[in-house]
Amino acid sequence: AFHEDEEVAEPRAVHYDYVRSGYDRGHMCPAGDNKWSAVAMDESFLLTNVCPQAPSLNRGDWNEMEQACRKWAKQYGDLYIVCGPIFYKGKTKTIGANKVAVPEAFFKVVLCMKGEPKAIGFIYKNGDGNRPKGDYANSVDEVERITGIDFFPLLPDDVEKKVEKTASPEDWGI
């Protein structure tokens, strides 16, 4: 069950912030990726690992992306995956007494170093989806531009430039 992260100072997200809010608690690191440890599984249900997510996105396209990442991990071995919320400039909608911020979108970037290194980024608006995964695909450079985050700064510069500049869904079977 979802539970508050007591290591975070109050005010912090609590269960009741989500009740009747119209939003699901959307995992950033999915529970299905944490079956290797009871502690990791429990921590995946901390409210610091979730964001208010449109139900159709959480149960649909975002869930499909989580499953695709697990499939790629089985296929390629080690992957580096970073995901999180996107807040554009302007007034942010909130839910609950603790004013949990509702992201306008979410990002996920995936890096595979096995064989020829490759990476891909995705951006999902926090709303209705039901589109093919390829429609959400972006270069990692584009996701970096939107989020302001440098995702793989420790890669050798030549590798980083190459894998981040293009999105090739076909390289990922999309």
Segments (PLM) and residue ranges:
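Domain-level detector of nuclease and nuclease-like folds
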Residues: 6-174
